[in-house]
From Swiss-Prot:
Its main location: membrane. One of its GO terms (molecular function) is aspartic-type endopeptidase activity. It comes from the Eukaryota. Residues 140-447 form the Peptidase A1 domain. Residues 1-124 form a propeptide. Not N-glycosylated. Proteolytically cleaved into the soluble active mature form in the digestive vacuole by cysteine protease falcipains; the process begins at the early ring stage. Proteolysis requires an acidic environment. In absence of falcipains, autoprocessing may serve as an alternate activation system. This is Plasmepsin II.
Length: 453
């Protein structure tokens, strides 16, 4: 009998009804169907077993290991330390590149670059723009609770604002439908205020009213004045598209609406912590997690000296540094250390001079530049003061975009102008350096972050 198995019998995964099994000497068609069905079931079971094994391997060796590492760090901390998740702008940028069919343009531009054409040969002009997307934004997500019944919320940890707000059960706008909502009627520690308020951000506006209740961060709780948000329409599409519920401001009191002390300062005022400071540690090997410590400094997060730079303004975490890139220099520039920025922003004129002869290509319609990851012409940033010197090598400001093209990287550097020449030292800087935000001494501490704990 012919039991030859032909490859095309399996082209759809399961055995075809008119396959070579018809060559078997089986008179009963029902028995033949049972055998075929048995093979199909066996195939499905085998496939499911392989997939379950793969899932278990990933869970055991990646996710579980990451959770265990984070829990070990939190357990051994001397001060209140909480883990947080990082949502980078990288995925949103790539989505936009694909949505607007820019992938081929970028590849073609890189071909121009490889052919020896100058950087001015790119597709798209310097004035092109895609609106309504804050590409420079990065979000640090941390968890906290509100009310004596500890209603859970996920917050953006934002050094560029100073109020805490949560969406209220009284919110009727569409953005609130998928969020955790604060219900004051379920908390015995709620105190009514009712003062109406509106919060303005770069991404939009939210409005609501002040309330007071117990706020818990980690194992610390305190009565705190915050905003119940009832209208998020002005904050769209950012709010609906993201996974956070509210914002926990870590800026200065002068930034706050209603002259509310930042929560870290209020923790010290109520003798919950010894020092009014917080720190950020972002592991280099894990782009999606970080650690916020409140009230003290965990020395195991950094190595070498911890250098402090005095603030030049009690509004943002803004210090004065001299900026050098090659022979380009800007003395006494404002430098804002910011947890809400995924890039290094530099004055436009400074950026244009820096990019000359670097073999980079502008991404059409977007404020970004692409280059080959092994581009040896890329420079090192140097920020200096009387107290210290802080460098940022290409490996820290390059973002690999292999899914656009092999060997391609994007520069996490954006041109941005302020009335006074200003640099924003965002995620690339904060991944290389452990940072301390010290309210008591009006300063920012900077030390080399440990690559491995």
């Amino acid at each position: 009998m012919d039991i030859t198995v032909r490859e095309h019998d399996f082209k759809h995964g399961f055995i075809k009804s008119n396959s070579t099994f018809d060559g078997l000497n089986i008179d009963n068609s029902k028995n033949k169907k049972k055998i075929q069905k048995g093979f199909q079931i066996l195939y499905v079971l085998l496939f499911c077993s392989v997939m379950c094994g793969l899932f278990y391997y990933v869970y055991e060796n990646v996710w579980l290991q990451r959770d265990n590492e984070m829990n070990e760090i939190l357990k051994n901390s001397e001060h209140l330390t909480i883990g947080f998740k990082v949502e980078n702008a990288h995925d949103r940028i790539l989505k936009t590149i694909k949505t607007h069919k820019l992938k081929n343009y970028i590849k073609e531009s890189v071909n121009f670059l490889n052919s020896g054409l100058t950087k001015t040969n790119y597709l798209g002009s310097s004035n092109d723009n895609i609106e309504l997307v804050d590409f420079q934004n990065i979000m640090f997500y941390g968890d906290a609770e509100v009310g004596d019944n500890q209603q859970p919320f996920t917050f953006i940890l934002d050094t560029g604002s100073a109020n805490l707000w949560v969406p209220s059960v009284k919110c009727t706008t569409a953005g609130c439908l998928t969020k955790h909502l604060y219900d004051s009627s379920k908390s015995r520690t709620y105190e009514k205020d009712g003062t109406k308020v509106e919060m303005n951000y770069v991404s939009g506006t939210v409005s609501g009213f002040f309330s007071k209740d117990l706020v818990t961060v980690g194992n610390l709780s305190l009565p705190y004045k915050f905003i119940e948000v009832i209208d998020t329409n002005g904050f769209e599409p950012t709010y609906t598209a993201s996974t956070f519920d509210g914002i926990l401001g870590l800026g200065w009191k002068d930034l706050s609406i209603g002259s509310v002390d930042p929560i870290v300062v209020e923790l010290k005022n109520q003798n919950k912590i010894e020092n009014a400071l917080f720190t950020f540690y972002l592991p280099v090997h894990d782009k999606h997690t970080g650690f916020l410590t409140i009230g003290g400094i965990e020395e195991r997060f950094y190595e070498g000296p911890l250098t402090y730079e005095k603030l030049n303004h009690d509004l943002y975490w803004q210090i004065t540094l001299d900026a050098h890139v090659g022979n380009i220099m800007l003395e006494k520039a404002n430098c804002i250390v910011d947890s809400g920025t995924s890039a290094i922003t530099v004055p436009t004129d400074f950026l244009n001079k820096m990019l000359q002869n670097l073999d980079v290509i502008k991404v059409p319609f977007l404020p970004f530049y692409v280059t080959l990851c092994n581009n040896s012409k890329l420079p090192t940033f140097e920020f200096t003061s009387e107290n210290g010197k802080y460098t940022l090598e290409p490996e820290y400001y390059l973002q690999h975009i292999e899914d656009v093209g092999p060997g391609l990287c994007m520069l996490n550097i954006i041109g941005l102008d302020f009335p006074v020449p200003t640099f924003i030292l965002g995620d690339p800087f904060m991944r290389k350096y452990f940072t301390v935000f010290d309210y008591d001494n009006h300063s920012v501490g900077i030390a080399l972050a440990k690559k491995n704990l």
